[in-house]
């Protein structure tokens, strides 16, 4: 008879207990959203040794490779809350601004659920340009001079008597497309008609701002009340076409860091813009808890605020989070729980990403075009608007993919990403090849 090794029962029981304990300690996370930003968040969470299960609602074809996608839309707040309860979700992370402004964080917290994201009251810093401008005016935070109008005739009279170019901003949420910079009175009149008479973004007000000059940069911070923890800088490319031409979009590419912004401007922005606005929101009874995004401009008079967002930027997140070495679950938990923030550690490698968008974007466009991705090793491909039908990857949004390269230099990151972009096969995508032109 062959000899049989009998595993010692005591040792076996101990190993079972250790495995079971480790499994029980693994966290379940729900990410809300279905774009490239959420793909980058899921990607970062998947690298956490603490996270065992990730759900994403609704997700996309790329996210489905890392998480279980849930067929719930971002504004199905009651259903998302019930899902989190039923599936014993330890932490929910909200990507888009729309559910935040609709109060999803308030609903979850009232139900005793842990969530990363600001209250509806705090989300007004993005959901209402007029609220943000008035807050900055009350607390002496540097920004462009402005006036707010709800009446077309009053707005047109004010604008035509002023200087051009001028900046016109729809007061509410407009998916990053509610800003127009007319260079002539005729362009301004048409834009005001579109916003105030035709209500192209819905009924609302228009903020008229002075036109500032200088390079823009994105400064995102993790904020928990008065605790403001900065991330590395990035720079977005808003215009649709090369040479910074065409209409504004949600963003056609980004890179990180931003060498044209000196450390003294970063320090000024943190001490005189980001920290003061966080303190202002605490003072006014709507403390911020989540990611505060400062869209800033380096003007001849120093950094000034162009806009605030109440969440991770998109496409900035796709070039910032790949550089984060700290366990992002610890970061999200610290903000959600009001506990001490871990020290953030960043990779010295730099990143640059190119957005591939459907032809016609940011206007009308067609969906459902097949996409063939090349063998990918040295770059990250974040899905922004994709779906998988019968095993075929297809376009499903305005912005479809973001290809992010990393390297020791921005030129190296640029070249790696652009090579992959040029090898992606799809009949209905366009991209800007000049991402990073200010620093290359």
Identify the function of each model-found stretch.
Residues 69-75, 147-151, 182:
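Short acidic-hydrophobic, aromatic-tinged amphipathic segments that line or gate anion-handling sites
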Residues 23-120:
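ATP-binding N-terminal substructure of ATP-dependent carboxylate-amine bond-forming enzymes
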Residues 270-292, 309-378:
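Active-site "cap" helix and flanking loop/linker of ATP-utilizing ligase/carboxylase catalytic domains
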Residues 9-25:
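Short, Lys/Arg-enriched N-terminal segments with co-localized hydrophobic residues
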Residues 333-440:
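Peripheral (often C-terminal) accessory segments that flank ATP-dependent C-N-forming ligase machineries
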Residues 118-178:
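A conserved helix-loop-beta module that forms one wall/lid of the active-site cleft
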Residues 178-315:
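Internal nucleotide-binding/catalytic subdomain
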